[in-house]
């Protein structure tokens, strides 16, 4: 990957690498910032300090992207941290990883508070001295960490997913094996926060071919900004979450994006009816449904939906997730980790070059989530995704829902148990229930139910806001004197949700 980016900088020095907040940055300008960061890290940090924090704000800054590659080119891994997330959550990430330095484009109150609370050094990138451009690719073991992303944890402690350089390079190689027709003239959409793994594809892939990544403006409605960016900048490669389509659907009759060559979706279920409607908006675009958890480096299965096909594959209305990418494999298991035959529904498990070696310093979680199978005299390690699926006779995989209490909203993975964890902390009540549902617009939302005779909506909302990122906050909270129970004595979650649906007309 670094060799590809180095070649892009050398071959296309005057072409644009990024468009951020109304400004273009050329590959040469980007390389200069990378080199300043690289020089600083190599001069001011020890080899033992192999993980560097970078800020990942809602508002994009060129320095944040340069910090990623400044870290990688200096032989270190990076950890994106959003300073706007709760201080306690960010502090747990810093405590787990032991990072001592955080790179940022702008120092604000959140960054200052984070640094003081955790006694770490903050480096403001614009203040770094100039340095000669240095694009030498470091000699680093491929099993060294490229980045660690932290996902929601059911105990209230974020869990780290380390991705190695081998994992990342394998993903890039697998992506290019598809033979997509992309080059330095293409324009990529980058709509994601840097703490979300899908962003890795949106900024790395264009940099590898000398193309330009277009980020969204911080102001305004995010999904509306997606459409504006697609249209005004004639985006050719659009990576999106399906929620974007749900938002734009009322305007499909007015949308015609002839320049889009590829529409790639990941992070949520892509429904066939809205995919078909979207295909009329992008008449020249291939539509790809991609699947993959953070543990398998961005995505690792793909299916191309094509309106010219006699019949596209789907299950319960959701487009197939397709076949494993180059270097990856997938199986369906039942009880006792037994591999099931085609057509049988079970848990989707993944193995291959993109798979993480395990959670960051969490052996108990690793034992729970990974298992090994002897195959051809070799031991293969598989990751249990927690997703229900089956594989058809053609080898295409179909997603059939979650096996546990985990969902995705706008691509962000959310453990409903984490929301319940903090709700219990506030109420001292054992009975709380965070329930996900689909709104009339087709977007996933969360309603929190609390068994309590006393309603304290404002206080609870403030408490949750202090402990959870914005995307995890419930869209509604209901206080109920006594929860309904089913015949097994368990909380009747369907009954709870029905009460809200009947009251508010939720679909």
Which residues does each predicted region cover?
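Conserved AMP-binding/adenylation subdomain of ANL enzymes
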Residues: 159-187, 197-236
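AMP-dependent adenylate-forming
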Residues: 3-26, 69, 102-116, 121-138, 146-148, 168, 286-289, 395-396, ...
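Conserved AMP-binding A3 loop
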Residues: 26-28, 144-173
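Conserved pre-ATP/AMP-binding loop-to-beta segment of ANL
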Residues: 133-150, 157, 182-188, 194
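Conserved AMP-binding/adenylate-forming
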Residues: 23, 40-84, 187-193
């Amino acid at each position: 990957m670094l060799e590809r980016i180095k070649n892009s900088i050398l071959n296309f020095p005057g072409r644009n690498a990024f468009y951020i907040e109304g400004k273009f940055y050329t590959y040469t300008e980007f390389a200069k910032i990378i080199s300043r960061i690289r020089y600083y890290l190599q001069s001011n940090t020890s080899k033992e300090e192999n993980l560097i924090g970078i800020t990942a704000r809602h508002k994009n800054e060129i320095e944040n992207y340069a910090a990623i590659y400044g870290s990688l080119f200096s032989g270190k891994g990076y950890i994106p941290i959003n300073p706007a997330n709760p201080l306690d959550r960010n502090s747990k990430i810093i405590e787990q990883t032991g990072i001592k330095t955080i790179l940022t484009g702008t120092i604000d109150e959140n960054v200052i508070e984070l640094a003081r609370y955790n006694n770490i050094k903050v480096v403001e990138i614009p203040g770094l001295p100039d340095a000669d451009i240095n694009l030498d690719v470091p000699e680093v073991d491929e099993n060294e960490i490229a980045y660690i992303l932290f996902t929601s944890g059911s105990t209230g402690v974020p869990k780290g997913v380390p991705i190695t350089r081998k994992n990342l390079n394998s993903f890039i190689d697998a992506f290019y094996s598809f033979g997509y027709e992309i080059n330095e003239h293409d324009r990529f959409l980058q709509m994601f926060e840097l703490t979300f793994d899908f962003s890795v594809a949106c900024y790395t892939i264009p940099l590898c071919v000398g193309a330009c990544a277009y980020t969204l403006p911080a102001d305004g409605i995010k999904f509306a900004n997606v459409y504006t960016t697609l249209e005004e900048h004639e985006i050719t490669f659009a990576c999106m979450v399906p929620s974007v389509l749900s938002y734009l659907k009322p305007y499909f009759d007015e949308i015609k994006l002839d320049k889009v060559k590829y529409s790639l979706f990941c992070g949520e279920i892509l429904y066939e009816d809205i995919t078909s409607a979207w295909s009329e908006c992008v008449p020249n675009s291939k539509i790809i449904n991609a699947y993959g958890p953070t543990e398998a480096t961005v995505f690792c299965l793909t299916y191309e939906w094509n309106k010219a096909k006699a019949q596209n594959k789907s299950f319960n209305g959701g487009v197939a997730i397709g076949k494993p990418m180059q270097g990856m494999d997938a199986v369906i298991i039942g009880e006792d980790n037994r591999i099931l035959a085609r057509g049988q529904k079970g848990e989707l498990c993944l193995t291959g070059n993109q798979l993480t070696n395990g959670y960051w310093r969490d052996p108990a979680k690793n034992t729970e989530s990974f298992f090994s199978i002897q195959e051809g005299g070799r031991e293969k390690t598989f990751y249990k995704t927690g997703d229900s699926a089956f594989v058809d006779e053609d080898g295409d995989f179909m997603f059939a829902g979650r096996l546990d209490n985990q969902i995705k909203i706008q691509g962000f993975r959310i453990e409903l148990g984490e929301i319940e964890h903090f709700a219990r902390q506030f109420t001292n009540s054992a009975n709380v229930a965070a329930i996900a549902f689909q709104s009339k617009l087709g977007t996933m939302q969360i309603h929190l139910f609390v068994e309590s005779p006393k309603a304290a909506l404002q206080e609870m909302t403030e408490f949750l806001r202090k402990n959870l990122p914005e995307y995890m906050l419930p869209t509604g909270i209901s206080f109920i004197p006594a929860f309904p129970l089913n015949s097994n004595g368990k909380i009747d979650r369907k009954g709870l949700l029905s009460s809200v649906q009947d009251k508010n007309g939720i679909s």
